[in-house]
Amino acid sequence: MSECDKELVDMVWGRNNSNGLADSVFKRWTQGFVFSASEPTALEQFEGGPCAVLAPVQAFLLKRQLFNTEHSNWRSCQDEEQKEILCHTLSDILEIVSFNSNSYCLASWLKEKATRETEQENPAESSQQNEQPTALAAEELGFERFHASIQKRKFNSLSELKEAVLETYSTWRNKYGVLLFLYSVILTKGIENVKNEIEDAERPLIDPVYGHGSQSLINLLLTGHAVSNVWDGDRECSGMKLQGIHSHADVGFLTILESLRFCKVGSFLKSPKFPIWVIGSETHLTVFFTKEMALVAPEAPSEQARRVFETYDPEDNGFIPDAVLEDVMKALDLVSDTDYVNLMKTKLDPEGLGIILLGPFLLEFFPEQSSKVPESFTVYHYNGLRQSNHNEKVAYIEGTAVMGFEDPRLQTDDTPVKCCLQTKWPFVELLWSADRPPSLI
């Protein structure tokens, strides 16, 4: 399979990819990074599946456009600017997964294969093709032929990588750009490193039946770690170590599944460094974002206390055994000598039930602090699927978020997007400028 390691293909598609993989699943993933004609900084998604790559890339692209540039109008972007911001974004993600190892890889076409998806002999013709509004017009390659046509290129410095990413802009734009970037991420991270982080190495990163990306794939792109869970830190279950997230990511993650109580996202993903969150529904990924940096202010002592407390409450019961109270207090640098801990046990568990509730614990050691979050601010939602947008034109939906309305009479709606956001802000209300609320599917 050329230089494209079979291990890589098995990791992405499963070991039985040559026999059991549906052609439709592979075809749904064969698209490039294409900007919307209606929203110059928004990427389009043609079919279900590749949102596992497109949504994280869109989130990092917005981070760069909103906070790393001096654009007076972040929604305006000319052709050359699109090239720069996309390539810089792809390089940013590759830098994250490399962890400053100064070793980077790109999956690219074999130099001797002058296919229609790659550089054309006629530059004018190539330029014209790359500006097409869809990346689906390139030649159809089957699963085997595609993987026989790519190679691995290595780079020993970030500057070399960035230059190569810019030079291959047409590759990212053309039909197999998303897959080539996904392979570049895995090769840069290292196949063995990915295997060591995935909970079940036998489970492929892309579901061979439905084509959805796994949580490990999403986490890899968002944090640089291919762990399978979204909670903070590691947990132990029946002697097995289950890896989670270990630091605040640049871009966050929220999921509708938490509102349905199927999982609980930890504060490292809920409270990223920038106010941008990939939003997960049962089948799709979208992006929610704002320019309000007060939403991601440094972690308050009470937030840190909640996070530490919850690491000792792996089943999310809202309480811990009183036997681990001393460990929690030590982790938070609170006074933890034996007599004081016993006094706190008596105060926090007056009925002698042997448990410490989260609420009384926070009130005792971290009384209510004034919030720095503004009462209202402008928010945006992105959904890359054409059919999920008005008139099938991919564009951001603008709205206003209002915080702090605990009176149920003031609730505006119970849409999926609000239910998802309430896992982070329980009393948020949303007023959208469009006639209908954003779709998460």
UniProtKB/Swiss-Prot annotation:
GO terms for molecular function: cysteine-type deubiquitinase activity; K48-linked deubiquitinase activity. Its EC number is 3.4.19.12. InterPro entries: EF-hand-dom_pair, MINDY-3/4_CD, MINY3/4. Keywords: Apoptosis, Hydrolase, Nucleus, Protease, Thiol protease, Ubl conjugation pathway. It holds the Pfam family MINDY-3_4_CD. The active site is at residues 51, 284. It catalyses: Thiol-dependent hydrolysis of ester, thioester, amide, peptide and isopeptide bonds formed by the C-terminal Gly of ubiquitin (a 76-residue protein attached to proteins as an intracellular targeting signal). It is found in: Nucleus. GO terms for cellular component: nucleus. Belongs to the MINDY deubiquitinase family. FAM188 subfamily. Hydrolase that can remove 'Lys-48'-linked conjugated ubiquitin from proteins. This is Ubiquitin carboxyl-terminal hydrolase MINDY-3. It comes from Xenopus tropicalis (Western clawed frog). The gene is mindy3.
